[in-house]
Regions:
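Soluble non-cytosolic domains of exported or imported proteins
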Residues: 26-35, 91
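A short glycine/serine-rich beta->alpha loop
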Residues: 18-28
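Sec/Tat signal peptide C-region and signal peptidase I cleavage site
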Residues: 9-13
């Protein structure tokens, strides 16, 4: 188990909500969606245990992701990104986003047409939505969505990673860890049962002598 812990990538050992360098500001006006998508892909690459996650940048994904705006479908380094719309009504949007984030720990690009502006929505923790807003007018890093330039009520659509071709290695490691934990649990159970058997045998012997 100790060896397995050494082999695990940082993504399994470190909370994604702890910023290790995921976030940055957009390079110029009008590229909030591109910057947010780059941060999303960066977090996903980190989650996959890829050392190259630090190389995922706004300019780096532009050639494949940008066409006068963020493309509704594109692929970067075997990570496929798609586009979807949100239901109407704040309550329905909130419920949908909570479910989406549960399936996408890397986050999603959330777009508010009323601004217009986009952020990387990172997580929903203790009843609060968090994000990283690429706008220079908002604090850097992971902040509550209430401190950002958009709102849940105004949000209408989002981009998310629909398929990831880089997570096979991570899945194998997770399976190996689960196998190690199961083996350790089985061994502990066997030892407990053996000890119980020995105690029962001792009691039977004592009873045969003095019973």
């Amino acid at each position: 188990m100790a060896l397995m812990a050494v082999l695990l990538p940082g993504a399994l050992a470190v909370d994604l909500n702890v910023d290790v360098g995921f976030y940055f500001k957009q390079s110029r006006g009008g590229t909030c969606t591109l910057a947010s998508a780059a941060m999303m892909l960066r977090r996903r690459a980190y989650l996959d245990g890829m050392d190259s996650w630090v190389d995922v940048t706004e300019n780096g994904i532009k050639s494949t992701a940008w066409s006068g705006g963020l493309s509704h479908s594109f692929t970067y380094n075997d990570m496929h990104v798609g586009y979807a719309t949100l239901p109407s009504g704040k309550a329905a949007k909130t419920g949908a986003l909570v479910s989406i984030l549960a399936e996408h720990p890397e986050g999603i690009v959330l777009y508010d047409r009323t601004r217009p502006h986009a952020v990387l929505l990172t997580d929903y923790t203790d009843g609060v939505f968090y994000c990283s807003d690429p706008s220079n007018g908002v604090a850097s890093g992971r902040v509550p969505l209430s401190a950002a330039s958009i709102s849940i009520g105004g949000a209408s659509c989002y981009w998310y990673i629909t398929e990831d071709g880089n997570d096979d290695g991570l899945e194998l490691l997770e399976e190996a860890v689960q196998a190690e934990e199961a083996a350790a649990e089985t061994e502990t159970t066997a030892e407990t049962e053996a000890a119980a058997g020995e105690e029962s045998g001792s009691q039977d012997w004592w009873t045969s002598l003095f019973g």
